[in-house]
């Protein structure tokens, strides 16, 4: 790896940009709106002007986190849309003025994994929650006005008017698509829809169970609906989620708080005469992964986990059940999607009125209101809140 810190030998003709950013300086404390400096892009990098950015629960998770991989001060945010302001050397995919989606999942197009249709896990830039640029060691493109380094987040850091990304994390898109809708495919909607469409490959007429009807679970429901699932059963502790879920294709609902003596899996197995074809765990609980696995049908059932539990959490499965029941358990990161291949396909499905994105956006606010938006997310009052830059 090279040292990519900005210095006087930077060959780019572009200069540092001074702009506003919402900086997370201490765990759980309100973000600080301040002016920062954004360095020019290095080779294979792109500097973009953010048009709008959306909030994701991953932002809240790392805003709260007090142990590694948390680090401060940091610029969070990873679901956004922007316009290319400048490019570093060796960047050929995009040019100044292109509309792009930043993605936390790299798609380098060069490694064995990116060239294979079997995986979306880039081996050249393995996914990790690093505070640095992915191509260069210990390298940030952000500093505050005192010269202190500000850390990156998930290869994106969209809570800033300008940000710098590796070209592996940028997807060029049609500029005519409404920004507040297109940005959703930068993370959340792609993750859920892709889990149903690409990871699980949900079949027409199948039965799907979704644990957790937050934004990701609702996106899974949307994906299952697009795939033609005949039954989409939502499981949640909040009964009001059923009414919301119905807009996304949820056909039935199980309130896990009112199952009395029966486990949720027992209720689901009775409802489905032996188990669902596909189960999705969207909460981030190892115990729910086990429950989802118990809900899926022997012989062909698939359990897909999308949530993240605390580090070190273990999933315990009976080895007899694993051997004799022939089920599949797998993880799905970014819905198994290759960003540069699949995002344009999803955008076309939006333009053809198949993929419904409008219903995900419940709030639109100014960037300066970001702390109010965080509160809405913490209180469960929004699905997706889009923040517009000035």
Curated annotation (Swiss-Prot):
| Residues annotated as binding Zn(2+) 1 | 56, 58, 78, 187
The cellular component terms of Gene Ontology attached to this UniProt record, alphabetical and capped at eight, are: cytoplasm
Q: Which GO terms describe its molecular function?
A: alcohol dehydrogenase (NAD+) activity; zinc ion binding
For this protein, the Enzyme Commission number is 1.1.1.1
Assembly notes: Homodimer.
Q: Does the keyword Glycoprotein apply?
A: no
Give the note describing cofactor binding and stoichiometry: Binds 2 Zn(2+) ions per subunit.
Q: What residues does Zn(2+) 2 bind to?
A: 108, 111, 114, 122
The family line of this record is: Belongs to the zinc-containing alcohol dehydrogenase family. Class-III subfamily.
Which of this chain's residues are annotated to bind an alcohol? Answer: 58, 78
What is its EC class? oxidoreductase
Subcellular location field = Cytoplasm
Q: Which UniProt keywords apply?
A: Cytoplasm, Metal-binding, NAD, Oxidoreductase, Zinc
PROSITE patterns linked to this entry: ADH_ZINC
Report the principal subcellular site: cytoplasm
- Know the name of this protein? Alcohol dehydrogenase-like 7
Q: Which cofactor does it need?
A: Zn(2+)
Catalyzed reactions:
a primary alcohol + NAD(+) = an aldehyde + NADH + H(+); a secondary alcohol + NAD(+) = a ketone + NADH + H(+)
Q: Name one Pfam family in it.
A: ADH_zinc_N
């Amino acid at each position: 790896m090279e040292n990519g810190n900005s210095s006087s030998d930077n060959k780019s003709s572009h200069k540092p940009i001074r702009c506003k950013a919402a900086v997370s300086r201490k765990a759980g404390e309100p973000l600080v709106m301040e002016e920062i400096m954004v360095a020019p892009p290095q080779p294979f990098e792109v500097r973009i002007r953010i048009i709008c950015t959306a909030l994701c629960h991953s932002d809240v998770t790392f805003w709260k986190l007090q142990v590694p991989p948390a680090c401060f001060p940091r610029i969070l945010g990873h679901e956004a849309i922007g316009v290319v302001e400048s490019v570093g050397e060796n960047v050929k995919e995009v040019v100044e003025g292109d509309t792009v989606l930043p993605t936390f999942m790299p798609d380098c197009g060069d490694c064995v994994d990116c060239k294979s249709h079997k995986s979306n896990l880039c081996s050249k830039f393995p996914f990790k929650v690093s505070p640095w640029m992915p191509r260069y060691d210990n390298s940030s493109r952000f500093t505050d006005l005192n010269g202190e380094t500000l850390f990156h987040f998930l290869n994106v850091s969209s809570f800033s008017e300008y940000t710098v990304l590796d070209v592996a994390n940028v997807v060029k898109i049609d500029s005519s698509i409404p920004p507040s809708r297109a940005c959703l495919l930068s993370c959340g909607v792609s993750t859920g829809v892709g889990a149903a469409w690409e990871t699980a490959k949900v079949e027409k007429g199948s039965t799907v169970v979704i644990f957790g009807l937050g934004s990701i679970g609702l996106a899974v429901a949307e994906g299952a609906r697009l795939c033609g699932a005949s039954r989409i059963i939502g499981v949640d502790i909040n009964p009001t989620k059923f009414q919301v879920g119905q807009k996304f294709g949820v056909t039935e609902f199980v309130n896990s708080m009112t199952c009395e003596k029966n486990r949720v899996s027992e209720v689901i197995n009775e409802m489905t005469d032996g188990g669902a074809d596909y189960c999705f765990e969207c909460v981030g609980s190892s115990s729910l992964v086990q429950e989802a696995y118990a809900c899926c049908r022997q012989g062909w059932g698939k359990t897909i986990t999308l949530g993240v539990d605390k580090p070190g959490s273990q999933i315990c499965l009976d080895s007899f059940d694993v051997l004799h029941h022939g089920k599949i358990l797998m993880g799905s990161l970014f819905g198994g999607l290759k960003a540069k291949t699949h995002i344009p396909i999803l955008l076309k499905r939006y333009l053809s009125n198949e993929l419904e994105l409008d219903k995900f956006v419940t709030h639109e606010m100014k960037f300066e209101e970001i702390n109010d938006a965080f509160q809405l997310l913490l209180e469960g009052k929004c699905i997706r809140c889009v923040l517009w830059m000035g």
